[in-house]
A protein has these predicted regions:
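Metal-dependent phosphoester-hydrolase catalytic domains
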Residues: 150-159, 166-255
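Structured beta-strand-rich core segments of catalytic domains in phosphoester-bond hydrolases
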Residues: 26, 32-122, 219-227
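Active-site environment of divalent metal-dependent phosphoester hydrolases
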Residues: 11-13, 39-43, 64-66, 123-126, ...
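N-terminal, active-site-proximal structural segment of metallo-dependent hydrolase catalytic domains
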Residues: 1-50, 61, 142-143, 243, ...
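His/acidic metal-ligating clusters that form di-metal
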Residues: 103-116, 134-161
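Active-site-proximal segments of metal-dependent phosphoesterases and phosphodiesterases across multiple
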Residues: 120-145, 168-177
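Acidic/histidine-rich helix-loop elements
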Residues: 3-19, 89-96, 121-137
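Catalytic metal-binding/acid-base residues of hydrolase active sites
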Residues: 9, 39, 76, 119-121, ...
Length: 255
């Protein structure tokens, strides 16, 4: 099964970029797509029109989508729910996004897969040391996420994906991966998943695909970065699809 996670960026030419993203997804061989920062239901509808190959969509909320989380799937989604993270730390605009985790059960040809799509709070200091104020916020969110993963039936495989806003080598993330019994599909990869800019020429990998095997099975994966190049919009302008790259994984279940 082929899975993608991507932060779609909530600002700047949003409808045009989402149409271009949807068209690219519709042409792809991806089976499950997990997006973050899709803030409005009208944008989820736009994606669905642009990518009709994905017959099944999971998102929560009316006008404003909870957590900005959307899952597109070629396979049936039997159930899904959104769980909001605890509100901690200073008052900040990001709280309006109601960040949390979306848990969905997808009926793949290989059997049921639990997909957890999430977007953690941003670290505005770019300091991921354990004592940083934003690291403490992330620790609370990760604790809630770990409890959600622990509650998933161990007979089911799990993929935890999204913009975790934590570098791969950060103690908060590595401790969470160990505590939750997960493995990082891109372990050891040093490439950034946030697009480098003159103001931030060497960003870290903030977007991750983490997996847990079902009891008695093995879930393995390989991954790569996608959607790194500019695209041409209908009016002729060139733009990137997002300020993040997509992370695509090929997951395989075996006994």
């Amino acid at each position: 099964m082929r899975l993608l996670t991507m932060n779609a960026l909530y600002t700047g030419d949003v409808p045009a970029r989402l149409r271009a993203l949807g068209a690219a997804l519709d042409r792809s061989d991806l089976d499950i797509v997990c997006l973050q920062e899709v803030m409005y239901r009208r944008h989820a509808r736009l994606l669905r029109r642009a990518a009709p190959a994905y017959r099944y969509v999971a998102c929560s909320g009316t006008a404003l989508l909870k957590g900005g989380l959307v899952l597109l799937s070629r396979w049936p989604i039997s159930r899904y729910r959104f769980v909001r993270y605890p509100t901690t730390g200073p008052v900040r605009g990001e709280l309006l996004m109601r960040k949390g985790a979306q848990l969905a059960s997808v009926a793949t040809p290989a059997g049921e897969l639990v997909v957890v799509n999430t977007h953690l709070s941003a670290n505005r200091d770019d300091d991921w040391s354990p004592t940083n104020r934003h690291t403490r916020i992330a620790a609370g969110e990760l604790a809630r996420l770990a409890s959600l993963i622990a509650a998933v039936d161990p007979s089911l495989p799990v993929a935890v994906v999204g913009d975790l806003n934590l570098p791969r080598e950060s103690a908060a993330l590595t401790d969470f991966i160990t505590a939750a019994g997960l493995s990082d599909v891109l372990a050891g990869d040093t490439r950034p998943t946030y697009r480098p800019t003159p103001g931030w020429p060497s960003p870290p990998a903030l977007d991750h695909i983490l997996i847990r095997s079902a009891a008695g099975e093995t879930l393995t994966g390989s991954a790569d970065l996608v959607f790194q190049e500019e695209v041409t919009l209908p009016d002729g302008r060139q733009t990137h699809l997002s300020d993040h790259y997509g992370v695509q994984a090929q997951l395989t279940r075996s006994k």
